[in-house]
Amino acid sequence: MKNLIIAKRYSKALFNLAEEGRMIEQYGEELDNFVRLLGKLPELADALRNPLFPEATRKAIFAAVAEQLALTPIVRSFINLLIVKKRVEHLESIAQYYHRLIDEYSNVARAQVKAAIDLDEKVIQEIAKTLEKMTGKKIVVEFQKDPSLIGGVLAQIGDFVLDGSVKRQLLNFKETLKRGALG
C-alpha cells in the first residue's frame, strides 16, 4: 500500500512537469529506458539503492548513466531526487503509474482479453471496437490465450469484467442447479 502511495505521488509530480513542458511521452520513454537498464544490471540498481554508498557516490554513478542514456534535465533531477529521498526501489512502480496517467490523459483504456483459442487480429479489433463503444475510450487490447476458459471470451478493463466464457456459463449453471436443488 505504501509503495502505491509513493508511486502515485512521485509519478503525478513528474507527469505535471511533463504536461507543462509537453514532454509526457518523452519522460515516459526515459523512465522506461532507465527501469529496463536497472533490470539488466542489478548491480547498478543495488549501487543506487544501497545506503552504505555515500549519496555523492550514488549521484555520480547515476550522472554517468544519465549521460549515456541522454536523459532530459527534468528526468535527471527527478531520479536524483529519488536517490536523495531513498526511493529508487520504487522507480518501477512509479514508471507503471506514470503510464496509467498517460493513458488517462490520452483517454486510453487497456483491456485484458482472454480466449480459449488464439483469435484473429480482425476479431481482436472487433472486440476493441465494441469495448470502445461501451467505455467511450480508445482501447488497447492485450490478448492472452487461456484454455481453462473452455470457449468464449473474457474481457477486463480495470475492475470492469465482461465474462462470456463457457467456463463462467458452466459455473452459473452449477449455481442454478444448487439453488434449485436446495429451494
UniProtKB/Swiss-Prot annotation:
The keyword GTP-binding does not apply. InterPro entries: ATP_synth_OSCP/delta_N_sf (IPR026015), ATPase_OSCP/dsu (IPR000711). The keyword Transport applies. Its main location: membrane. F-type ATPases have 2 components, F(1) - the catalytic core - and F(0) - the membrane proton channel. F(1) has five subunits: alpha(3), beta(3), gamma(1), delta(1), epsilon(1). F(0) has three main subunits: a(1), b(2) and c(10-14). The alpha and beta chains form an alternating ring which encloses part of the gamma chain. F(1) is attached to F(0) by a central stalk formed by the gamma and epsilon chains, while a peripheral stalk is formed by the delta and b chains. This is ATP synthase subunit delta. It is a peripheral membrane protein. It is found in: Cell inner membrane. HAMAP family: ATP_synth_delta_bact. Signal peptide: none annotated. One of its GO terms (molecular function) is proton-transporting ATP synthase activity, rotational mechanism. Belongs to the ATPase delta chain family. GO terms for cellular component: plasma membrane; proton-transporting ATP synthase complex. F(1)F(0) ATP synthase produces ATP from ADP in the presence of a proton or sodium gradient. F-type ATPases consist of two structural domains, F(1) containing the extramembraneous catalytic core and F(0) containing the membrane proton channel, linked together by a central stalk and a peripheral stalk. During catalysis, ATP synthesis in the catalytic domain of F(1) is coupled via a rotary mechanism of the central stalk subunits to proton translocation.
